[in-house]
Swiss-Prot record:
Annotated protein name in UniProt: Endoglucanase 24
Catalytic activity annotation: Endohydrolysis of (1->4)-beta-D-glucosidic linkages in cellulose, lichenin and cereal beta-D-glucans
GO molecular function: cellulase activity
PANTHER family, sorted: ENDO-1,4-BETA-GLUCANASE (PTHR22298)
EC number(s) from the headed UniProt entry: 3.2.1.4
UniProt keyword Acetylation, yes or no: no
């Protein structure tokens, strides 16, 4: 006999898991958080800033990027609190911004949908530049990370080498090219109605980028010419095969082409997509891949892809504490926890997948089957909402982990531009080591990076507002990007539970 997971039958469980005494139960302003989560990206911009730049303490930077290769590589985003443009996580950021618009754009106010598309275009434009010399060359990074991380200076003052790192055929860069394929494909869908010409350009470049990724299979971090500069920052720890499947899946979604359907069907097992199904982030795409492809099974009756749906359901069930089988770990206060730093990247990406899968199930009037449990879509939304509310302040610290949201939030984040005096207030350059005094200061950052979500607390739910503890205090673009979609949903459905 199946146990149906409904509030009336599990009152005690829901009360204990979702309303623990350590939590505040304040209602959050998800619309405000949504606006700020998008605004954050303006603080990460590289290149020439537009006249309507809202994060006004920032100025132009990285204006010579690409000149050593006689190519314009200006634009894009700095990944985190440094001044390097790492294409691997930037492409993932782009994919997730686009997916946020695709799945949840309908829930956004028109002004925030516009702002989301502006944020998306800022990175997709840069990625187009990075693949402009295909079929023989792809650019994967701009900025010497060793030199950059040895300095504490504003992006506007950068005097460290702005090395442009290229991978030339037949050397491989499958993980970066595969993720860039996904990013350009997803962006092409996001822009399809508002800018069809640009959408087509994105898609054409996605196709040729995938050809490079698949023809020259292998990891860019195994390339002797660049591996010491991409590792240990954004090494390919999980293998490149998941990015090939991920890129093909997005091309399938963008084109409807049967060849990509055949690719993801025939390569699932050879590429190991049945492993590590409970992971999703800038390095491991398997969790997101399974959810994305599941839509074809749930809504399109493509039962030849049933294995992807089975893995997606296994992942979803691992998030349900009452289900049998392996579970992901939660902190005592209910935050999704995985070993390593920057915990909130897991909370935002997995919350995104929970909401997307709940949407797929709801549209087909289905529930999730976890052994003897039948889990309705609203339960998945409840799990996601708990993560969101934790991030926004319902946690033992009583602290919002989004900068600028709520009354209490991190003031000493690990971020060069935010922690140094702005070029508006201090026009003179602050050179490499001269910024150390600001890094070591216990004073709050002078420039508020509104909307930035920091790495977050440890397994004990504790957080020290310490600039030097980058694992906890550093924001990243790939923490925020999926959070845009999550917040869009709850801004429109604040009572969803």
């Amino acid at each position: 006999m199946k146990l149906h997971l409904h509030p009336l039958s599990l009152v005690f469980f829901f009360f204990f898991f979702f309303f623990r005494p350590t939590m505040s139960s304040n209602q959050h302003d998800y619309s405000d958080a949504l606006s700020k989560s998008i605004l954050f990206f303006e603080g990460q911009r590289s290149g020439y800033l537009p006249n309507d730049q809202r994060m006004t303490w920032r100025r132009n930077s990285g204006l010579s990027d690409g000149w050593t290769h006689n190519i314009d590589l200006t634009g894009g985003y700095y990944d985190a609190g440094d001044n390097v443009k790492f294409n691997f996580p930037m492409a993932f950021t782009t994919t997730m911004l686009a997916w946020s618009v695709i799945e949840f754009g309908e829930f956004m106010p028109s002004s925030e949908l516009r702002n989301s598309l502006v944020a998306l275009r800022w990175s997709s434009n840069y990625l187009l530049k990075s693949v402009s010399q295909l079929p023989n060359r792809i650019f994967v990074q701009v900025g010497d990370p060793i030199a950059d991380h040895n300095c504490w200076e504003r992006p506007e003052d950068m005097d460290t080498p702005r090395t442009a790192y290229a991978v030339n055929a037949p050397n491989p860069a499958s993980e970066v090219a595969g993720e860039t394929t996904a990013a350009l494909s997803a962006a092409s869908i996001a822009f399809r109605s508002s800018d069809p010409g640009y959408s087509q350009t994105l898609l054409q470049n996605a196709v040729k980028t995938f050809q490079f990724a698949d023809m020259y299979r292998g990891a860019y971090s195994s390339n002797d010419d660049i591996k010491n500069d991409v590792c240990p920052f954004y090494c390919d720890f999980n293998g490149f095969q998941d990015e090939l499947l991920w890129g093909a899946a997005w091309l399938r979604k963008a084109t409807g082409d049967e060849s990509y359907l055949n690719y993801i069907e025939s390569n699932r097992e050879p590429f190991g997509a049945n492993d590590n199904v409970d992971e999703f982030g800038w390095d491991n795409k398997v969790g997101g891949l399974n959810v994305l492809v599941s839509k074809e099974v749930i809504e399109g009756n493509m039962y030849n892809l049933e294995a992807y749906k089975a893995s997606a359901e296994s992942f979803m069930c691992s998030l349900v504490p009452e289900s049998s089988g392996p579970h992901v770990e939660y902190t005592s206060a209910g935050l999704l926890y995985k070993p390593g730093g920057s915990q909130l990247q897991h909370a935002t990406t997995i919350s995104f997948l929970l909401l997307v899968y709940a949407q797929y199930l709801s549209r087909s009037s289905l529930s999730l089957n976890c052994g003897t449990l039948t889990v309705p879509p609203d339960y998945l939304r409840r799990l996601a909402k708990k993560q969101v509310d934790y991030i926004l302040g319902n946690n033992p610290m009583g602290l919002s982990y989004m900068v600028g949201y709520g009354e209490r939030y991190p003031k000493r984040i690990h971020h060069r531009g935010s922690s140094l005096p702005s070029i508006v207030d201090h026009p003179e350059a602050i050179r490499c080591k001269d910024g150390s005094v600001y890094f070591n200061s216990t004073e709050p950052n002078p420039n508020v990076l509104i909307g930035a979500v920091v790495g977050g607390p440890g397994e004990d739910d504790m957080y020290d507002d310490d600039r030097s503890d980058f694992r906890k205090s550093e924001p990243t673009t790939y923490i925020n990007a999926p959070f845009v979609g999550v917040l869009a949903y709850f801004a429109a459905n604040p009572g969803s539970s």
